Swiss-Prot record:
Pfam families: Na_sulph_symp (PF00939). The keyword DNA damage does not apply. The chain crosses the membrane at residues 30-50, 55-75, 77-97, 104-124, 160-180, 207-227, 242-262, 298-318, 323-343, 362-382, 399-419, 428-448, 452-472, 491-511. Keywords: Cell membrane, Ion transport, Membrane, Sodium, Sodium transport, Symport, Transmembrane, Transmembrane helix, Transport. One of its GO terms (molecular function) is symporter activity. Its main location: membrane. It is found in: Cell membrane. This is Sodium-dependent dicarboxylate transporter SdcS. Belongs to the SLC13A/DASS transporter (TC 2.A.47) family. NADC subfamily. CDD domains: SLC13_permease. One of its GO terms (cellular component) is plasma membrane. The binding of Na(+) at the extracellular surface probably precedes the binding of dicarboxylate, since there is a competitive activation of succinate transport by Na(+) and an uncompetitive nature of succinate on Na(+) affinity. It comes from Staphylococcus aureus (strain Mu50 / ATCC 700699). It comes from the Bacteria.
Length: 520
């Protein structure tokens, strides 16, 4: 257990150092300084020199704002969340929206869905339910190296559907490293050292990749999907329900996890090690250390099941009571959160209730503000006439094969998100794709859904996603290895996303991909 705690602490320090070491000496890096100046400069140049005849002044103004915000998001000239507050200042100044209209977007139902999801995830982490779930899954799947690898991927992927992918990977990596350490200590004379090293690398990458892939399973699994839900509602007035997305997302996760497991086990790090010395013993030992399920864990488990059932059945069961429009996914998320604040804990030395307001310190408020900023900007694009104008300009693409457009969008976003924030990428590109769908005459989800899914999938570089940074921080994998393996996982993801969006999603969501929707 000491080894487990030691490695968790070590990884946390490396993870933080990875993102902070370049910012110790100067307030801005060279790239940030360029972005800091370039953003307002593009804003001014657009206002002064860009005046198409068929674009009203308000549209030019919102385009200028968009270029400013996008530049600061990409370069992270200031914190992304701080940049996301710019619409509150700039949109009312241009008489695009009133202050009340802009501010209301930061309190959208979708933001409260994610807020409730965060609170539920923190409750799981506080009472260590996620560790028990992960270890139980690994223990059930089996003891061979192939099954241990699969077990870690399934456990991490499942957790990341409901808790942040960062938290899921941070929990699983120390367990994985402890198993590898045990294998080295118990190594038999006839055990191939190279095989253990290959298994070690495959396990570390498997955990990181599964944390990223699992987020595609539910709307609260990853920020780009919440942004997709919000932008789709904002531009077209239609909802993507929690239940229907799960029917699309979970099979996607299962297929991606399965193919990635096969690739890591039999192609990228092929080895002859069938059983890992001490592996299954250590898993059982850690389960024993957790002891019997505590009262607080049972409460959180019950609340988790209740939340899942309500999200899944809301659309189907509430229709007969004619209150579907009054009970949104965000309503359920906040109801569940309030229950967690009400129910008392037995272990009152640590916490009086299952969740208390100390949880506010752990909530990622910056992500919620980013969502609000994206929705406010989308509203401005729609109200100013910019969306309509963009649609007219993009009509030249009409006649291009929709599948070709989907392929280009998916691959472009997949590699763009390797070097930019996935939330910022989705927030920037989805409004453009909403307009493009009208111009080329296809259903908006045919373009928006693959972009949102691809924005979540970055496997090549440590800066691509927090899970990548964590596994790189373990010291077990080099950037070169991560890039070479991640490139092929990127391509695998692109193929699966394209197939799912083109052939599965229309059936599940009941949409005609060749039928465009009018912009609001």
């Amino acid at each position: 257990m000491a080894y487990f705690n030691q490695h968790q602490s070590m990884i946390s320090k490396r993870y933080l150092t990875f993102f902070s070491k370049s910012k110790k000496k100067k307030p801005f890096s060279a790239g940030q300084l360029i972005g800091l100046i370039l953003g307002p400069l593009l804003f001014l140049l657009t206002l002064l020199f860009f005046h198409p005849q068929d674009l009203p002044w308000k549209g030019v103004y919102v385009l200028a704002i968009t270029l400013w915000i996008a530049t600061w998001w990409i370069t992270e000239a200031i914190p992304i969340a701080a940049t996301s507050l710019l619409p509150i200042v700039l949109l009312p100044l241009g008489h695009i929206l009133t202050p009340e209209q802009v501010s209301s977007e930061y309190g959208n139902d979708i933001i409260f869905l994610f807020l409730g999801g965060f609170i539920l995830a923190i409750a799981m982490e506080r009472w260590n339910l996620h560790t028990r779930v992960a270890l139980t899954i690994i223990n059930l799947i089996g003891a061979s190296t192939s099954k241990i690898l699969l077990g870690f991927m399934v456990a991490t992927g499942f957790l990341s559907m409901f808790v942040s992918n960062t938290a899921a990977v941070m929990i699983m990596i120390p367990i994985g490293l402890a198993i590898i350490k045990e294998a080295h200590d118990l190594q038999e004379a006839n055990t191939n050292q190279t095989s253990i090293q290959k298994f070690e690398k495959s396990l570390v990458l498997a955990i990181g990749y599964a944390g990223t892939i699992g987020g595609l399973g539910t709307l609260i699994g990853t920020p780009p999907l919440i942004i997709l839900k919000g932008q789709y509602m904002q531009h077209f007035g239609h909802e993507i329900s929690f239940a229907k997305w799960m029917i699309v997302g979970i099979p996607t996760v299962i297929v991606l996890l399965g193919i990635t497991w096969l690739y890591l086990r039999y192609v990228a790090f092929r080895h002859d090690l069938k059983y890992l010395p001490g592996g299954q013993t250590l898993i059982k030992q850690k389960l024993d250390e957790l002891g019997k399920m505590k009262y607080e864990e049972k409460v959180v488990q019950t609340i988790f099941v209740l939340a899942s059932l309500l999200w899944i059945t809301r659309e189907f069961l509430l229709k007969k009571w004619e209150v579907t429009s009054s009970v949104a996914d965000g309503t359920i998320a906040i109801f569940i959160s309030i229950l967690l604040f009400i129910i008392p804990a037995k272990n009152t030395e640590k916490h009086r209730r299952i969740i208390d307001w100390e949880v506010a310190k752990e909530l990622p408020w910056g992500v919620l503000i980013l969502f609000g900023g994206g929705l406010a900007l989308a509203k401005g694009i729609s109200e100013s006439g910019l969306a309509k104008w963009l649609g007219e300009q993009l009509k030249s693409l009409n006649g291009v094969s929709p599948i070709l457009i989907v392929i280009v969008i998916t691959i472009f976003v997949l590699f763009l998100t390797e070097v930019t924030s996935n939330t910022a990428t989705a927030t920037m590109i989805l409004p453009i794709l909403a307009t493009l769908s009208v111009a080329v005459g296809v259903h908006p989800l045919l373009l928006m859904a693959p972009a949102a899914m691809a924005a979540n999938c970055a496997y090549m570089l440590p800066v691509g996603t927090p899970p990548n940074a964590i596994i790189f921080g373990s010291g077990k994998i080099s950037i070169k290895q991560m890039a070479s393996v991640g490139f092929w996982v990127n391509l695998i993801s692109a193929i699966i996303i394209i197939l799912v969006v083109y052939y599965v999603m229309p059936i599940v969501l009941g949409i005609d991909i060749n039928q465009p929707l009018p912009l609001k």
